[in-house]
Amino acid sequence: MSLPDKAFPVSWDQFHRDARALAWRIAGLDREWRAIVAITRGGLVPAAIICRELGIRLIEIVCIASYHDYTSQGEMQVLKGIGASLLENQGEGVIVVDDLTDTGKTAAIVREMMPRAHFATVYAKPKGRPLIDTFVTEVSQDTWIYFPWDMGFTYQEPIAGGKRG
């Protein structure tokens, strides 16, 4: 499989550094946080890192699926909502975390549930950017990000093609 023209492969090390950078930015806001809501599945890894860095123990998930073929999003469906206690005060004091905002459709659904929550993503694309309060890296809309959990190691043919010298 070849990468698209605007591919952005992210290693585990790079993602960890970027998620910690996001935690630093959130810490710089100097606010009290009561919980993190991770948007599954992409928000699980950065949420774990941010929880650790900020000392937040209460973690919730919201699961929103868009049925797609990895080139276009389909209809959005909430598969698992957010617990009532975190919806109090419209999500005030809650950080909503995802790996990426692309079109902003997922963030818009969660923003309706929690309009006063703080939305944070590691990466942002221009269409989704207005819905996000804090992010680390912006990429163009036509860039495809390959996250480390989507990639695996594969055998690489030797440069010499197996010839012995």
Swiss-Prot record:
The gene is gpt. GMP binds at residues 102-106, 144-145. Purine salvage pathway enzyme that catalyzes the transfer of the ribosyl-5-phosphate group from 5-phospho-alpha-D-ribose 1-diphosphate (PRPP) to the N9 position of the 6-oxopurines guanine and xanthine to form the corresponding ribonucleotides GMP (guanosine 5'-monophosphate) and XMP (xanthosine 5'-monophosphate), with the release of PPi. To a lesser extent, also acts on hypoxanthine. Belongs to the purine/pyrimidine phosphoribosyltransferase family. XGPT subfamily. It comes from Brucella suis (strain ATCC 23445 / NCTC 10510). Mg(2+) binds at residue 99. This is Xanthine-guanine phosphoribosyltransferase. Pathway: Purine metabolism; GMP biosynthesis via salvage pathway; GMP from guanine: step 1/1; Purine metabolism; XMP biosynthesis via salvage pathway; XMP from xanthine: step 1/1. Keywords: Cell inner membrane, Cell membrane, Glycosyltransferase, Magnesium, Membrane, Metal-binding, Purine salvage, Transferase. Its EC number is 2.4.2.-, 2.4.2.22. Guanine binds at residues 102, 145.
